[in-house]
């Protein structure tokens, strides 16, 4: 169920285009594009680079305070499982996440 590299969107696209692209891929696999998943992808797309779950949560909650930290973690887990997001451990600190589709 991973999104294959050949399916990646072209580089230099807007965050909205990435959200739409990921949504299409998820729906084609029978997955839902939830509000939490959309918010996580938007945060990663807008802020770029490697963000911790707490960084992502701060960005998400600034845009939509009704999304809880546990929802962000669930969205990150689901998106990582689907190959949309990758997480890395840099040293002994918290894991960081980035979009693998871009």
Name the predicted role of every residue range:
Residues 1-18:
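C-terminal regulatory/oligomerization modules of transcriptional regulators
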Residues 72-82:
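Basic amphipathic alpha-helical segments that dock to polyanions
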Residues 38-43:
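Pre-recognition alpha-helix immediately N-terminal to the DNA-recognition helix
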Residues 55-61, 72:
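A short acidic, leucine-rich amphipathic alpha-helix
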Residues 17-29:
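Short, Lys/Arg-enriched N-terminal segment that forms or immediately precedes the first helix
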Residues 46-52:
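Short capping segments at the starts of secondary-structure elements
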Residues 81-102:
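Non-DNA-binding regulatory cores of transcription-related proteins
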């Amino acid at each position: 169920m991973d999104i294959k590299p050949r399916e990646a969107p072209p580089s230099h696209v807007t965050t909205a285009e990435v959200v739409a692209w990921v949504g299409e891929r998820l729906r084609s696999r029978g997955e839902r594009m939830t509000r939490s998943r959309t918010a996580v992808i938007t945060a990663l797309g807008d802020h770029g680079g490697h963000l911790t779950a707490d960084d992502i949560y701060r960005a998400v909650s600034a845009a939509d305070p009704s999304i809880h930290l546990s929802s962000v973690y669930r969205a990150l887990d689901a998106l990582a499982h689907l190959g949309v997001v990758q997480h890395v451990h840099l040293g002994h600190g918290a894991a960081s996440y980035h979009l693998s589709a871009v």
